[in-house]
Structure formats: structure tokens, C-alpha cells
Amino acid sequence: MVPKLFTSQICLLLLLGLMGVEGSLHARPPQFTRAQWFAIQHISLNPPRCTIAMRAINNYRWRCKNQNTFLRTTFANVVNVCGNQSIRCPHNRTLNNCHRSRFRVPLLHCDLINPGAQNISNCTYADRPGRRFYVVACDNRDPRDSPRYPVVPVHLDTTI
């Protein structure tokens, strides 16, 4: 019985360690506020092809992000969406700070097509342009954010 207990404790520690590593892969780089990281990941008026556009994000994350959506609009326009009625976030149902855009915007959705890439310089993406509504989570600004916007987008929850 002792070996089984010992083995199960090691398995638990390994699992917790892996969860910590995976969680850190999704974390924003510490030098950015949540709003700044949102802008880097999701705002681009004229994004280049996905494989090129994703390099900046992947360089901060040190891995190939599976998918990403660039909204072809301005940060100020997304901030204005934060003023729309609050709704429960469709993909993260524990959050009630989401807001749906009133208008469709052009966007570029990127899907990783070589998930086994060992080096971030080899990440390759398929481009899926579109025009959709979007839902963002918004929070009060971080003291490091511009005081121009008291409430800022921090998470792209979904596109519709």
C-alpha cells in the first residue's frame, strides 16, 4: 500500500506541476497590463498575413499560440463597446463583465496549422478573414494604463 500511496502522490505533484506550466503559457507577459496585452493580441487595423502577425505574440509566449483573432478596428472603438450593456461572457460563463459590439467589424482569424512546431519561428497559420460581431470583457484600467479610458477591454471572449 505504501508504494501505491507514494506513486499517487508523485503523480499528483507531476500533474500540479504540469498545470502550473500550462497556466504560465497562457499568462500575459508581466511588462504589459491586461489592456495592453489585449491590444497587442487582438487589435490591428491592417494585419499582415497570420504567420507574420502572430510572430509578435509568439515571441512573448515562447510557443505557437493555437489560434488568435485580430479585430480590424481601433482600441478606442473597442473601448466604446465597453460602454454597451454588460452580459455574461459566452465562453467564460463565470464572468459578467462582457459587452457585445453593435456592429460587425472586419477581422482576421488565425489557426495554427503545424502544432508540432518545435521552434516559434516555424509556426505557420491559416488566414480566415471575416466580418463579425465580437464580445469583450472589460475592467477598470490598471494604473499603468492611460487615464484617457477608465474602463478598458482585457479579453476577447468570442466573435459571432
Swiss-Prot record:
The modification 3'-nitrotyrosine is found at residue 60. The record marks 62 as: May be involved in LPS- and LTA-binding. GO terms for biological process: antibacterial humoral response; antimicrobial humoral immune response mediated by antimicrobial peptide; chemotaxis; defense response to Gram-negative bacterium; defense response to Gram-positive bacterium; induction of bacterial agglutination; innate immune response; innate immune response in mucosa. CDD domains: RNase_A_canonical. GO terms for cellular component: azurophil granule lumen; extracellular region; extracellular space. Disulfide bonds join 50-110, 64-123, 82-138, 89-98. The keyword rRNA-binding does not apply. Residues 1-27 form the signal peptide. Residues 28-72 are annotated as: Required for nearly all of the bactericidal activity. Its EC number is 3.1.27.-. It is found in: Secreted. Pfam families: RnaseA (PF00074). Its main location: secreted. The record marks 60 as: May be involved in LPS-binding. Substrate binds at residues 65-69. The keyword Transcription does not apply. Cytotoxin and helminthotoxin with low-efficiency ribonuclease activity. Possesses a wide variety of biological activities. Exhibits antibacterial activity, including cytoplasmic membrane depolarization of preferentially Gram-negative, but also Gram-positive strains. Promotes E.coli outer membrane detachment, alteration of the overall cell shape and partial loss of cell content. Interacts with bacterial lipopolysaccharide (LPS) and lipoteichoic acid (LTA). In vitro interacts with and insert into lipid bilayers composed of dioleoyl phosphatidylcholine and dioleoyl phosphatidylglycerol. In vitro, tends to form amyloid-like aggregates at pH 3, but not at pH 5, nor 7. This is Eosinophil cationic protein. It comes from Homo sapiens (Human).
